[in-house]
Amino acid sequence: MRWWRARPGTFRFLVRAAVLMAAFYSVLYYSYGDASLPARVLVRYLGFLARVSGGVVALFDSSVRVDGVFILGRRPLRIVLDCAALDALALFAATVLAFPASARVKLIGFAAGGAISWGFNVMRIGLLYVAGVKWPRLFDVLHEDVMALSLVLVSVGCFAVWAALSRGNSARLAADASSGA
């Protein structure tokens, strides 16, 4: 244990985050049976994401309706696990949990960053629908490259902002405590 504490804080953070990411990805991408509880929860989540995203798209295209994990309209979309942003949320959660901050600060950070990432993903799905209708030749590159990277960058950005704010908050609390305030 002394060896671990002697390592630089950045090293400890990176190792913790990597271990948590491996654990989260293992749970997320494990090959569950269709009737298992995790598989049923994931399918319900994908259906919920399809309903919310379809509702946003329906604001601009009245032909849109949702059936399970399908957004149907002028450019049908099927919401699958890779569309769910759970991998980006897992990255965000792993880094927040690995970061040296109080449980309360981590919970606030996860709630705020998770909501931002989730909202961005809903917007991403809506934009992909529009791109599929208006610019079908761009759809694949937007879907597989641009928007996928954007989602990861939003999660990383949320972490960076949260880490800076939580670090500043910790420094301010430490200064207040040492000054007797």
For each predicted feature, which ranges?
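Hydrophobic N-terminal alpha-helices or hydrophobic patches in metabolic proteins across all domains
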Residues: 1-181
